[in-house]
Amino acid sequence: MQSSTVQGVEQLLKEFLGEVPVGVSNRHVHLSKEHLAILFGEGAELTPKKMLSQTGQFAAEETVTIEGPKRSIANVRILGPVRGQTQVEISRTDAFALGIDAPVRDSGSLEGTPGIKIIGPKGSITIDEGVIIAQRHIHMDEAAAERFGVKDKDIVSVVVDGPRA
């Protein structure tokens, strides 16, 4: 049980700094333009389903199947827009189920990571590297970063309410 002083300080901080929405990103794929064409057909474009908190990024209507040595996972959401390099972000549980030893990495840090087969409606590809378990991170706009006094790559602590807090 927290003291009234601690609760008062927490309330003041919330009022001063504001709260940051927290979410969990499920498994997803970022595709290069070349791989999008192979998987969905020449000239294919991603169809936005839901805009994400990061400006200009979205969850696409399109999904793929990812296939590892042990099993496959269907209906994996693609995030857009297209990227320079294809990457697959999964959970530790997914990695175990797929039979892949994926490292915890920052998004885009793909050197030396395992590959995977990606299957779409028009074709399939096998990437030699690009499967990661995403390092915990926070997306926030510049105004929020300034308000919290943080910059890109800073390490922060986050407190959340809930039954597992």
Where are the language model's segments positioned?
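Short beta-strand-centered segments at strand-helix junctions
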Residues: 21-69, 74-121, 126-159
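Short, low-complexity, charged amphipathic interaction modules
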Residues: 1-17
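Short, intrinsically disordered, charge-balanced linker/junction segments flanking boundaries
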Residues: 163-165
